[in-house]
Each structure stands twice: as structure tokens, then as C-alpha cells.
């Protein structure tokens, strides 16, 4: 998933190589502010996740690729804890520890293919827009199988190549769609990886993600560039895109619209074969 310096390699198609994203150097500074969600939105996610996770409580949860801890405390609160936020980038973990502390949360230095927890630890595991960062997704999924309890469930919240969301900013950065097609897996690819590691596919879910706040606030958050897609655009493309946004904002022509978010649910069967 990353080196000790927080360099995160994003998986890509051979025809569109993607550079590593340095979350210690670049992304951590504005990430928490740019990606912050109001409590009602966090609760909306928890309510949706609860419908697809094991019914018993408490649940031990792993937040894999937890970043600045945007969801980790909520996972502990909603499902009774403990919750483990596993994140390779030291600066992101430090931000989480400073701003997203919770008595039932532990933040751990770790990579997706080397999760620093014992076998059969978790009842539930969340990957929220982190899977595309894993350089060896097959190894990561095998490691996830190791740390899951029999009957445990995995929620993979990701963009999928065949369902790139139409974000309000998409048209201002014309190459962003192609970049995301290179960054993200397809649903059949994700399903094949998990089933090869012994998981059963439970379902694919799509939820509406509301537009947060007003458009001026959304523009200011976007300027923080806490979108990994932007790491693969040139400075000229970014400057031109933000100039187009400024013109549209002045003209009042930016459309505030919700987007659709996808996630897949997988279960580790009670008699899962050892795929390591």
C-alpha cells in the first residue's frame, strides 16, 4: 500500500501509468478540512453500513486506509468498538490522532498487504476510497481474509471504472474522467479478487451522496486539492480548470447536484479456504 515515507502507489492500467501520491508531503495538510463531512452525513453512512454488516454488537472494525480518521471514530461509536484505523502515511495518522481521537479507536501504522493485527480480528472492515491506492490488490485482499473472522463482512466503498461519478467539478477538468478510469477497478475485477481469496460476494449497493453546503464552500474545499485525481493532472490543467470554475462561479452557472456512490459487500464464509 505504501512505503514507510507515506508514498502511496495507485493501481493503474498499463496504458496509463500513475505516479505515487505522497500523503506525507502533500495531501495531509488540507485533507481533513477538504474532506470533512457534517455529522448528519457521517450518520447517513453509518446507517447504510449497518444494514450490510453483521447484526450482533459490538463489532470489531478495521478502517483500512483510514487517512485522517474521517470515519474511524464513527465506526467505533456506531458498532460498539474497538475500531482500528490502519494507515501507512505518518502525517495522516498524526492528523487523525490529533483530531479524530476516540476511546475505542487505535490508529496503527500499516499497509494493506501487512495489516498489524492478529488473524481473525475483525467482524467488519471498511475501505473508503482507499482500495485504488493498494499497489498489489490481490495481496491486500488475501491479507484482509486473514484478519477477518468467519462470517465477517467487508465494505468496499470505491469508484468503479464503469460507473465514474458525475461530480459537479468533472467538466472543468476534462481529463479527470480518463484518469479515474485508469485509477479505479471495475466491479467484476473487484469481485474476482475477493472471490479468489475465498470471499462470497453479498451485493453491490449504490447510495445518493448529497451536495454538502453551498457551491462557494465546495469550490474553496476543492482548491485544497484533496482529490487524488488531481495528483495526476498537470499544473496547467489544474490552473485552467480552476479558472473555468471561477468564471462559472461568477456567472452563477455551476450546478449543485448530488452524486451516486458505489460500494460492494463481501463476506468471509465460516469455512473459508486458506488462500495465503
Regions found by a protein language model. Give the residues of each.
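A short acidic, Gly/Pro-enriched loop at the edge of an enzyme's catalytic core
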Residues: 113-124
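Conserved Class I S-adenosyl-L-methionine
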Residues: 38, 68, 202-276
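A short glycine-rich, Lys/Arg-flanked "PGG" loop and its adjoining helix->strand segment in the class I
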Residues: 138-150
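Class I SAM-dependent methyltransferase SAM/SAH-binding core
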Residues: 62-64, 68-114
Amino acid at each position: 500500500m505504501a512505503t514507510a515515507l507515506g508514498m502511496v502507489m495507485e493501481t493503474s492500467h498499463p496504458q496509463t501509468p500513475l505516479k505515487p501520491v505522497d500523503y506525507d508531503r502533500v495531501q495531509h495538510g488540507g485533507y481533513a478540512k477538504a474532506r470533512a463531512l457534517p455529522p448528519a452525513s457521517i450518520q447517513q453512512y453509518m446507517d447504510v453500513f449497518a444494514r450490510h454488516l453483521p447484526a450482533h454488537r459490538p463489532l470489531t472494525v478495521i478502517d483500512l486506509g483510514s487517512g485522517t480518521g474521517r470515519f474511524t471514530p464513527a465506526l467505533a461509536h456506531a458498532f460498539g468498538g474497538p475500531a482500528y484505523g490502519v494507515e501507512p502515511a505518518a502525517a495522516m495518522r498524526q492528523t487523525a490522532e490529533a483530531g479524530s481521537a476516540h476511546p475505542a479507536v487505535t490508529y496503527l501504522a500499516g499497509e494493506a498487504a501487512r495489516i498489524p493485527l492478529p488473524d481473525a480480528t475483525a467482524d467488519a472492515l471498511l475501505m473508503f476510497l482507499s482500495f485504488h491506492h493498494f499497489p498489489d490488490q490481490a495481496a491486500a485482499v488475501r491479507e484482509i481474509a486473514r484478519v477477518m473472522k468467519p462470517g465477517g463482512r467487508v465494505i468496499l466503498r470505491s469508484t468503479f471504472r464503469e460507473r465514474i461519478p458525475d461530480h459537479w467539478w468533472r467538466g472543468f477538468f476534462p481529463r479527470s474522467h480518463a484518469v479515474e478510469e485508469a485509477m479505479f477497478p471495475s466491479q467484476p475485477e473487484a469481485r474476482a479478487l475477493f472471490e479468489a481469496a475465498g470471499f462470497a460476494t453479498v451485493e453491490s449497493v449504490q447510495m445518493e451522496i448529497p451536495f454538502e453546503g453551498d457551491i462557494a464552500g465546495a469550490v474553496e474545499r476543492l482548491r485544497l486539492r484533496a482529490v487524488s485525481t488531481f495528483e495526476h493532472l498537470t499544473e496547467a490543467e489544474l490552473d485552467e480548470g480552476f479558472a473555468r470554475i471561477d468564471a462559472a462561479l461568477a456567472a452563477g452557472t455551476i450546478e449543485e447536484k448530488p452524486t451516486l456512490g458505489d460500494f460492494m459487500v463481501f463476506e468471509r464464509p465460516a469455512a473459508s479456504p486458506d488462500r495465503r
